[in-house]
Amino acid sequence: MFEKITLAHKDLFSRFLSAQKIVLSDVSFTNCFLWQHARLIQVAVIRDCLVIQTTYKNQKPFYFYPIGKNAFECVEELLKLEKNLRFHSLTLEQKDDLKDNFVGVFDFTYNRDRSDYVYSIEELIALKGKKYHKKKNHLNQFLTNYANFVYEKISPQNKKEVLEASQAWFLESQTDDIGLINENKGIQSVLENYESLDVKGGLVRVNGEIVSFSFGEVLNEESALIHIEKARTDIAGAYQIINQQLLLNEFSHLTYANREEDLGLEGLRRSKMSYNPVFLIDKYEAIARN
């Protein structure tokens, strides 16, 4: 019933996701495609709903909320298939729907580590006011030191160069962090299949050399979803410039930027909070009692 996710499933995702407003980063096709190296991600259509199943090594699978008109019927089928059925990354509305329609069936918990951070695109481009003072200083330092910088869209012509830069920075980091190793594999997968995905990306050059890059996609009619942002750590302001330039050049017609979760990592949480999110999308987990 379930199939391991491949590029061939992109149209299937598009068919279901386009029928309703998606706000979570988790269920984007690009997000699933990027992170398939970190866990087994499988998909199926059950009761005319898209079902995404995720399994980490040596763990039981979990599911995202079914995407489609017959979500409750789909949940009933999943309860038959899976003992102690587990859902992750439920919105408050989805959690309440399960609680109200499957009374006493599930136990629920709030998972702060998975909350999506959502920012004002207008604010991140302008960086005005006291709350952005440090970020603006970093940006101004970059603009002063590298006034000749060039922004380019990621394209078939330069994606190989982006991949080479990404790989070089990864090797220089000498990391043994499995999350970063899998992220690196995911970046490679996205760049190698760039034209087939609905992503918009950009890079910044200084004296012809790539110093930062980022890519994301349109999530819904008001929001962008930023998947990846990478920069040279020895160049002050390299992260701030690509953050600003990607939003300015690719997503300025939208209102919000979803920059995904912090995974409970203290440094990542500090970094994400320092950009002053306008709100967080809370996520919940559910486990069936059977």
Q: For the regions a protein language model found, what residue spans apply to each?
A:
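Short, conserved active-site entrance elements at the starts or edges of catalytic domains
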Residues: 157-209
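Aromatic (often tryptophan-rich) hydrophobic motifs at membrane interfaces
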Residues: 200-289
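Short catalytic-loop micro-motif centered on adjacent basic/acidic residues
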Residues: 88, 152, 256-259
